[in-house]
Curated annotation (Swiss-Prot):
Role: RNA-binding protein with binding specificity for poly(C). May play an important role in neural development.
Annotated Gene3D superfamilies: 3.30.70.330
Domain RRM: 26-106, 121-192, 392-464
UniProt biased composition (Gly residues): 1-14
Cellular component, GO annotation: cytoplasm; nucleoplasm; nucleus
Post-translational modification Phosphoserine, affected residues: S199, S464
Sequence position, cross-link Glycyl lysine isopeptide (Lys-Gly) (interchain with G-Cter in SUMO2): K34
Polar residues bias spans: 196-209
Name the UniProt record assigns to this protein: RNA-binding protein 45
Record organism: Mus musculus
GO MF, one example: RNA binding
Locations listed in the record: Cytoplasm; Nucleus
């Protein structure tokens, strides 16, 4: 168990979960030296804005700092600017190790990963249908450098749907836009485009969208990951569900009418949403809509997680596949299996037996790891013996979730001299140990910034190798 020491506004008082994440993305996560004090953190981070709380995670028994801290700002833009300017900096003249700074995930979201920069730069806005992309750019350029603007249009008529996206170059600029733009735009962070098969537990569904829908938090919408495992296992066993025609397009039926904006807000929970459409039928009191995703995996996930979802409360929506002329049965079975593995990998496994289940349990152990990527990988090579001296360690960041251990070992052993791969429990990071520096450098060159099985890897050099016992106690 961990404990935390804080330096809040009332002598160590730590706010509740609700105030910790209000407003969203206003809290940063720091990896620092174990000797860094709360006072130093306040001195270095106060120039970025109003600090509401600072606390350092400590060992429950020894009260020693674990090298992890949190800083809570009053505004999201302040936290983002602190992240942008302080990540990779040294806190003091005597410090030789640069700190790591991330936007911390909402504690009530059910997710256990940190938010990546690219998730914080694109905002979703509701605009007048008469707006052009130039009008949209003109309205939002005052908040920062815009990478692009886009307006969602009806694919048949080309008419604007009154929805748009604005992507900024920096997270702080997007946060400034959300905080300061006219309330009529209902600006909020959009789901990142590069997410392929994320889970609701991993997505940061903003509170603003929940308020617009009048719905309960997503943690209640998707309460138990075991249900998804069961559903996908059933799907993979050739029962009636497995025989259902699968496509990227979904039909949504409800006894209560809904608007395109409401439908979009519900199905944008699952990454990869392409468009929503609600046909007008003056002779029917029912709601009917069509939803299409960019990939089949997202459509499958949306179908099996949102079918039967109550919106509004008491009214269950019916979600089914619409035939789009594709036949992808075998591909879907593989995707479904991989998605189950990804879900299990992203959970917090607090015991050794649970970690062993992740690595060895279930059907995954009986199959060779499946690697889908456009990266040219070398052939598999034998691992080095566990007792081999460590010559180089790599630090790996996963977005949106860690890959399974067997897949990671299959990937990193291809460069030769691999000793061990391990994941940090509850985080989307891990370490790779090599017995040869050349092998480690080849892994960095080949894998850094690449996407494997829908997961983007950041691969970089970690600290110099130390004794295993000291290393494990150093930060976590």
């Amino acid at each position: 168990m961990d404990d935390a020491g804080g330096l809040g506004g009332s002598g160590g008082f730590r706010p509740g979960v609700d105030s910790l994440d209000e407003p969203p993305n206003s809290r940063i996560f720091l990896v620092i030296s174990k000797h860094t004090s709360e006072l130093v953190l306040r001195e270095r981070f106060s120039p970025f804005g109003d600090i509401q709380d600072i606390w350092v995670v400590r060992d429950k028994h020894t009260k020693e700092s674990k090298g992890v801290a949190f800083v809570k700002f009053a505004r999201s833009s302040q936290a983002c600017r602190a992240m942008e300017e302080m990540h990779g900096q040294c806190l003091g003249p005597s410090d030789t190790k640069p700190i790591k700074v991330f936007i911390a995930q909402s504690r009530s979201s059910g997710s256990h990963r940190d938010v990546e920069d690219e998730e914080l730069t694109r905002i979703f806005v509701m605009i007048p249908k008469s707006y052009t992309e130039e009008d949209l750019r003109e309205k939002f350029k005052v908040y920062g450098d815009i990478e692009y603007c886009s307006i969602i249009k009806n694919k048949v008529t080309g008419e604007s749907k009154g929805l748009g996206y604005v992507r900024y170059l920096k997270p702080s600029q997007a946060a400034q836009a959300i905080e300061n733009c006219d309330r009529s735009f209902r600006a909020l962070l959009a789901e990142p485009k590069n997410k392929v098969s994320g889970s609701p537990e991993q997505d940061d569904y903003s509170s603003g969208r929940q308020e617009a829908l009048g719905q309960e938090p997503r943690a209640n919408l998707f309460p138990f990951v075991g249900e998804q495992q069961s559903e996908f296992s059933t799907f993979d066993k050739n029962d009636s569900r497995g025989q259902e025609a699968v496509s990227k397009r979904l039909s949504v039926v409800s006894r209560v009418p809904f608007t395109e904006e409401q439908l979009f807000s519900i199905f944008d929970i699952v990454p990869g949403l392409e468009y929503c459409e609600v046909p007008r039928d003056p002779y029917s009191n029912y709601g009917h809509g069509v939803v299409q995703y960019f990939n089949v995996a997202s459509a499958i996930y949306a179908k099996y997680k949102l079918h039967g979802f109550q919106y509004p409360p008491g009214n269950r929506i019916v979600v089914s596949f619409l035939d789009d002329g594709s036949n992808m049965t075998e591909l879907i079975r593989k995707m479904a299996t991989q998605m189950v593995a990804a879900q299990l990998a992203s959970m917090v496994w607090s015991t050794t037996s649970q970690q062993q289940f992740l690595q060895y349990g279930g059907n995954a152990a009986s199959q060779a790891p499946q690697i889908q990527t456009d990266v040219v990988l070398p052939s598999c090579k034998k691992k080095a013996p566990p007792e081999t001296p460590v010559k180089e360690r790599l630090f790996v960041v996963f977005n949106p979730h860690p890959l399974p251990l067997d897949v990671l070992e299959d990937i990193f052993c291809r460069f030769g001299n691999l000793i061990e791969v391990y994941l940090v429990s509850g985080k989307n990071v891990g370490y790779v140990k090599y017995a040869d520096r050349k092998s480690a450098n080849e892994a960095i060159t080949t894998l850094h910034g690449k996407i494997l099985n829908g997961v983007r890897l950041k691969v970089m050099l970690a600290d110099s190798p130390r004794e295993e016992s000291k290393k494990r106690q150093r930060t976590y």
